[in-house]
Amino acid sequence: MSEKKYTFETEVDKLLHLVIHSLYSNREIFLRELVSNSSDAIEKLRYESISNAALNEDDTDYAIRIDFDKDAKTITVSDNGIGMTEEEVIENLGTIAKSGTKKFLESLTGDKSKDNELIGQFGVGFYSSFIVADKVTVRTRKAGQDKSQATKWVSDAQNGFTVETITKEKRGTEVILHIKKEHLDLLEYHVLKGLVNKYSDCINTPIQMKKVEYDKDGKQTVKDEYETVNNTKAIWLRSKDEVTDEEYQEFYKYISHDFADALMWIHNKVEGNLEYNSLLYIPQNKPFDFWNRDKDYGLSLYVRRVFIMENKELLPPYLRFVKGVIDSADLPLNVSREILQHNKVIDKIKKAITTKILSELKKLASKDKEKYQKFWDSFGQVLKEGVSDDYSNKEKIAGLLRFATTQSGDSKQTVSLADYISRMKEGQDTIYYITSDSYKAAANNPQLEAFKKKGIEVILMTDRIDEWMMSTLTEFDGKHMKSIIKGDIDLDKFETPENKEKFEKETKDFEKVLKEIKEVLKDKVEDVRLSKRLTDSPSCVVVNDYGMSLHMQKMMEEAGQGFMPGMGMKPILELNAEHNLVQKLKNEADTEIFADLSELLLLQAMFVEGAKIEDPMAFVKLVNKYIR
C-alpha cells in the first residue's frame, strides 16, 4: 500500500524543536525512554494474555533487544510486546495526548537550564529519539493482528510523518534511529550497554544485545547470539543492602521520567497476614501540571511481578505526589479496576503505606530539617488536604504542617504547630491563627495589633486551602485552635486590672453611640462593638465563631459558589475606642457626617480584610469627600 503523509499537531512541532535544540546535553535519555516504552508494551501484553493466551502467538520469551549497525549508522530498539495498530501509531506518535501541553509550552522561558528542568518534569518520551537521530523509522504489529496488517511510520521531525501498511512476521515494535553524525560515538557496544546499566538496569524485562568478543589485539567481533545485559530482578524485590543509592535514583528516573533525583525513597517488605513489597519515592519538585485535576496519578500495581495498572486506589489523593511500585502476592492476576475499588487487600495496603509515608516524613522532619523544608515547599499545600480528607491520620498530618508566623520574620513556612506550642506565653492555652490572601495582608492585618503588643505569636495562613483545612483542625495536642478574625477574643488573662477597668468604662460610655451606628448601617452588619483586638487602627470586621470568614466568602464567590443560609454572612464591626476617628464619630452631632463616618469605618475595615465591596465607586467618593 502506498504511504500516507501527515503533519504533526502544533504542540508536537514545538516540542520536537525544543527536544532537538534544548536537550543536546541530555542525549542519553533517548535510550531510557525507548526501553521504558518497550517495557510498558511487554507488560501490557503480559497482562492482556492472562485472559487471551492467543495474543502471545507461541512466544512468551518477552525481551527488549538493542542492535547497532556502524555501516548503516543505526540503533534499533525492538520488543515483542503488545504492538500498535495504524490508528494507535498515528495517535501515539503524531499527537501529544497529554493534558496541559499548551500551558507547558507557554511556561518556557528561553533560559536553557530552566527550560531543561521544565521539559524533564513534562517528559518527552518517544520524541527524545530526535536528540540523536535525524530520521526515525517505527515498524510495529499489534498482537493478534494479521502479519500483513503491520504499520511503518517514518519522520525526520521536519516535514511531518508518513505511514504505510507493511508485512511484519513478529508482533511488537522496532524503533530504528538513523544517528546524526555528531552522535556516531553511540554506535559502540560498551556505550549502549553502559547506558542500559546506568538507566534501565533494574527493569523487569530482559534487555538483550548481541555478544561481543575481543581478540588479543583488541579487535571486536559481534556474534549472532544475544545475551541479557541488565539485572532483571525487580529492584523492589531485592534486599535494601543489595541496592545502591545510584540504582534507587536511576529506577526513580525510569518510572517518573524526571531529570532530577528523588528527594527520598521508602523501600519496604511486608510479610505475615498481608504480603507485599513496595518502593516509594518522593520527588524533589512538583511537575508543571501538578494542580491539573484531570491528571492521572497513582502507584504501579504489580501482582507477583506482573504489571497490572497504574492505580489511584493505592494512595489517598493528598499523597498523589508519591511515585513508586507495589507488588502484592495477595491479589489475583486477572484483577480488574472495578474490583480494586472495593478490595479489602487494596484497602489494607493503602492504609499501611499511608501510615508508612507519614511516619517517614516525620522522621525526615526531625533528622533533616533542610530536606524536609524542600519537601514542604513543593508539596505542603497538597498535604494539607489530608487534614480534612483523612480523619484517622489528622493528628499525624497536622504535626507535619509548616507555617509562617508573626515571629518567623518572613513568608517562608517553617514553623510547626509543636514549635508554636513550645514558645506559647505562660498561661496561654490557645493556638491563634489568621487566614488571608497573602503574607503581607496577613502580617499587616489590624486584628494582630493586640497580639503583637502582648507578645502572643499568631500563625499566618495564606494558602487557599487553609480556611477549608481549619474547619476540621480545631485542636492540636490538646490546644484549641482559634481564628483571630472570628468571634470574641479573650485576652483578659494577659491584661492589667487597670486596662480591664478602662475597657469596661469605655463600653458603657459608647453604649449609645454603638446602637446609633448599628441603626445607620442597618442590615450591613450583624453587630457593632468595641474591640479588644485593636490598638492603632480605628476599625476591623470579624464574623461570629461559626460563620464563614470574609476571606472564605470572597473565594467562594470567585469560584461561583453560593452560600447556605445561616452561615453568618454579615460582618461584626469592631471599633477602637481610643482612635481619633472613633472619638470624632462619638462626638459628632451632624447626622450626615455621622452616617458617612460610620459607613467609612465599615468600608475601610472590609477593604483591609480583602472582603468584597459591592460599590467600590461609592467608597472612593466617600473617601474623597472627607479628604481635606
Curated annotation (Swiss-Prot):
Chain intervals for the UniProt region annotation (C): 555-628
Q: Does the keyword Chaperone apply?
A: yes
Of the GO CC terms on this record, one is:
cytoplasm
Q: Where is the major localization of this protein? A: cytoplasm
SMART domains for this protein: HATPase_c
Question: Known InterPro entries for this protein?
Answer: HATPase_C_sf (IPR036890), Heat_shock_protein_90_CS (IPR019805), HSP90_C (IPR037196), Hsp90_fam (IPR001404), Hsp90_N (IPR020575), Ribosomal_Su5_D2-typ_SF (IPR020568)
Q: Which UniProt keywords apply?
A: ATP-binding, Chaperone, Cytoplasm, Nucleotide-binding, Stress response
- Highest taxon listed in the record's lineage: Bacteria
Output the Gene3D superfamilies linked to this UniProt entry. Answer: 3.30.230.80, 3.40.50.11260, Heat shock protein 90, C-terminal domain (1.20.120.790), Histidine kinase-like ATPase, C-terminal domain (3.30.565.10)
> SUPFAM superfamilies in the record, alphabetically?
ATPase domain of HSP90 chaperone/DNA topoisomerase II/histidine kinase, HSP90 C-terminal domain, Ribosomal protein S5 domain 2-like
| Annotated region described as A, given as residue ranges | 1-337
Q: Where in the cell is it found?
A: Cytoplasm
Recorded hits in HAMAP family, A to Z, give: HSP90 (MF_00505)
Q: Relate the assembly described in the record.
A: Homodimer.
Q: Which PANTHER family does the protein's record reference?
A: HEAT SHOCK PROTEIN 90 FAMILY MEMBER (PTHR11528)
NCBIfam families, sorted: PRK05218.1
Q: What is this protein called?
A: Chaperone protein HtpG
